[in-house]
Design a protein with these regions (language model features):
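Glycine-rich adenosine-cofactor-binding loop
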Residues: 129-149
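NAD(P)H dinucleotide-binding glycine-rich loop of Rossmann-like/cofactor-binding domains
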Residues: 33, 77-135
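Residue-level marker of beta-strand positions
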Residues: 3, 56-58, 76, 88, ...
């Protein structure tokens, strides 16, 4: 079978490898699609020879181990697991779920969806009608906007430097869309905006708490995006960090963050079985039409185009 294997930084090739072996308690799955995750862009750019990537697979059960229950050959499945950039993978039934009949394969890649649902849980509780901003409107940001709409948030402010991303944000439920340089001043609480307000006469903090937004979610994965998200959070607000910051250290104004006394929430999830439990919920929400987040895929690449796909992701 074929597999994408790295040859070094930014360079891969498709090679022939043996079919994977699976036990009586595992599934052998023929992969139809594997989603590209921005968390793997930096590792791709500095990869060592022999490294493999891919953790967002969807496919069809080719064979089921004799002890496996609930799955059979021909079932469409998705779930959690690595090494997905190859024709066949081995999956653990505990971390695998069925794809509903009314969902396309490309809409049912569940790993990032489970990450989004975990983010929504960590940003709770939310009172219906609460405002929130989403900084970074790529795939994850758009999914978060649509999920926040389902959760009952009111004003949803989308922020991105790409006009086309803001158009997509409107499609998935954003009520306001802003380029970074065009954000209304009342949504920003930093040293500059505070310097324009006489806070010495603000003994009860009414002026201070009128600035910024109480809930902000960051999905840029960049230092500039994270700093901007921090500027948007109101005093005693909440900042959810969903962007994957794995390329270098971040230089942040923690003096400002400290003064604003907001809560910073790491929205990533490392409890594999907990995340696995969210997977079927995500697909059920999509299948029922409650979570309106389908038809997002805009590029499908061959295995031979893996490097091109990463280069295009880098450009955006």
């Amino acid at each position: 079978m074929k597999q994408i294997v790295m040859q070094g930084p930014r360079k891969s090739r498709v090679v022939e490898v043996p079919m994977p072996e699976f036990t009586d308690d595992q599934l052998l799955v023929k992969v139809t699609y594997t989603g590209m995750c921005h968390s793997e862009w930096y590792p791709w750019s500095v990869a060592k020879e022999g490294e493999v990537f891919g953790h967002e697979a969807v496919g069809v059960v080719a064979e089921a181990g004799r002890n496996v229950q609930g799955f059979k050959p021909g079932d469409r499945v998705t779930g959690l697991g690595g090494g997905g950039y190859k024709e066949y993978i081995v999956m653990d039934p505990v971390k695998t779920c069925h794809v509903p009949d009314n969902l396309k394969d490309e809409d049912a890649i569940v790993e990032p969806l489970a990450c989004l649902l975990s983010c929504a849980v960590k940003m709770m509780p939310a009172t219906p009608g609460d405002p929130i901003a989403v900084v970074g409107c790529g795939y994850m940001g758009l999914g978060m906007i649509s999920l926040f709409r389902l959760c009952g948030y009111g004003k949803i402010v989308a922020v991105d430097k790409r006009p086309e991303a803001l158009e997509n944000a409107k499609r998935f439920g954003a009520t306001e869309c802003c380029l970074p340089g065009e954000i209304p001043s009342e949504y920003i609480l930093n040293w500059e905006t505070m310097g324009k307000v006489d806070l010495t006469r603000d003994s009860n903090n009414e002026k201070l708490f009128a600035m910024g937004l109480p809930n902000v979610m960051e999905f840029t994965g960049t230092e500039d995006g994270l700093r901007l998200a921090g500027d948007l959070v109101s005093a005693h607000g909440r900042l959810g960090i969903g962007g994957y910051h794995n390329d270098s250290f971040r230089n942040l104004d923690y003096k400002l963050w400290n003064f604003k006394a907001f809560t910073s929430i790491n929205c990533h999830e490392r409890r594999v079985l907990y995340e696995a439990g969210l997977c079927q919920r995500c697909l059920d929400l999509l299948s029922s039409g409650l979570w309106k987040f389908t038809g997002v895929t805009d590029h499908i690449y061959s295995m031979e185009e893996f490097d091109k796909a990463n280069e295009e992701m880098e450009a955006h």
